Amino acid sequence: ACQAAVVPIVAMLTVENVFVKPGSKKEAERAIGVHAQLAREGGGSSDFSTLLAIYQLATEGGSTREWCNDNCIHWRAIKTAQSICEQLGAILDRQDVRVDEKDEKIVSSDSMSQRARQALCYGLFGNVARTVPGRRSYRTMDGHGTVAYIHPSSVLFGADSTPEWVVYHELVDTAKTYMRTLCPVKYAWIKDLLPRLHNVDVYRLSECSAKRPRKDSEAEPSSPPPSPKR
């Protein structure tokens, strides 16, 4: 399977501020350069593979703190991700799910494996977007049809060509709506998943079924007014 790739990605998505953004101009320029190199290490085609490359490079040996300092990565974010990986690994062990790391090493490869990207489709099928023909914007497929743009921090930002279909981790609303942390996907992977978006019970997912708004026909009949006293 692809757990060896997906588990670290999930862990990295749960932490904030992975990238250090120095205040001085000189250090900021250096950070941009090293972050671009890290994106290339992950294949340069997916923000998820960049996160995986960062995790693997930071934890594969030596001093994690020193590596983070050299590459403008927050050390505490990596340590937190490591802890989450251990917790997720323990859960997989209890479920008797084996992780075959040799099949899912991403560093120095051209891209994430197809299995890992397909797994992201299944996990994030509610966060699918399709490009708007003739424009550099997308529309989300969640039923709202929100117009969204690739976030400037993405490795896909400013690319000569944009993928037709992507999955994203989150939407960020500023002057525009941006998709942050993206991965190109194929329509064949998601065509059977898209209809599920119309069958999702958000109240059940959020454990709020008891508070579900009732239709007028389901409303309890109002009690008759008390009889006036004589």
PLM regions with names:
Residues 1-215:
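Second RecA-like catalytic domain
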